[in-house]
Regions:
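Extracellular/periplasmic metallocenter environments
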Residues: 35, 42-50, 144-262
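Extracytoplasmic entry segments of secretory-pathway proteins
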Residues: 2-165, 177, 261-262
């Protein structure tokens, strides 16, 4: 006697609400695809966030009299071997006064953080002029000076709540710490200087290069924690929507502020 087995008998159709049967195999394939996507995202996080952060130095700032002075610069390029053409931040080591190619720094909790930010990259009109407004600093203002390549100051110590990127080409990026509600437009050299005379070797220096110098202050959180900061202007040229590449990479235009218990 010959017994015939139906090889498809194990695949019992599952009736969807819409009435279309979905086989067990199809469901398994869908679950596998979802697992691959989740695993890929986890790998991305591990490599670009956890692994990237552990590979970079952290610049530590200590408070004096309840205040700490953080010094940053953003450049149109950097001195790395892997992505030298990516726009990037540098952090000044307070002990050596040397510029460190990192975007990780630490500050004490509940301290006044005085930031000096040198902007060497060229101007890019903001896609949304909402980000021209200064938010989250003490007084919701910044103080701005701008210099040409000869050191001539053409804007002097201007304290303002707005750096209007639509009325003039004078903003290169933004410096934002969303977790504490801080949003600051980062001033740049003007349009003619941006077109012809930008710094070409990083870390940039004030000698022989046009730049903007911007100062502002904020109070660090009272609790310890790691707070992401980044540029929220989609100006990553050559990348989808301008938000990829250096805009989302640790060590370039995204970083972390580590708030430590004082």
């Amino acid at each position: 006697m010959h017994v015939r087995y139906d090889l498809n008998a194990c695949e019992s159709p599952v009736e969807k609400r819409g009435g279309d049967p979905v086989s067990v195999t199809a469901r398994a394939v869908s679950l596998l695809a979802a697992f691959v996507v989740v695993a890929g995202l986890a790998t991305f996080v591990a490599i670009y966030f956890i692994g990237g952060a552990s590979a970079m130095p952290t610049v530590h700032y200590a408070a004096s009299g309840g205040q700490v002075n953080v010094v940053l610069q953003e450049d149109p390029q950097n001195d790395s071997a892997s992505k030298p053409d990516w726009v990037s931040y540098y952090v000044q080591d307070p002990a050596t006064q040397k510029w460190v190619h990192t975007t990780l720094f630490s500050v004490p909790a509940n301290a006044r953080v005085n930031v000096t930010l040198y902007g060497y990259d060229g101007c890019t009109p903001l896609r949304n002029n909402y980000f021209s407004q200064v938010q989250g600093t003490i007084g919701n203002t910044v103080t701005l000076s701008q210099f040409d390549q000869h050191g001539k100051e053409y804007v002097t110590d201007k304290t303002t709540p707005v750096i209007n990127a639509w009325s003039d080409c004078n903003v290169g990026h933004t410096f934002a710490i969303p977790g504490i509600g801080l949003y600051v437009p980062v001033a740049s050299p003007n349009a003619p200087l941006s077109a012809n005379n930008l710094c070409s070797e990083s870390p940039c220096t004030t000698s022989g290069n046009p730049y903007a110098k911007e100062t502002f202050s904020f109070i660090s959180p009272a609790r310890a924690g790691v707070f992401r900061w980044q540029c929220l202007v989609p100006c990553g040229g050559g990348f989808l929507d301008g938000n990829s590449g250096p805009m989302q990479a640790l060590g370039y235009m995204m970083g972390e502020m580590d708030v430590v218990s004082s």
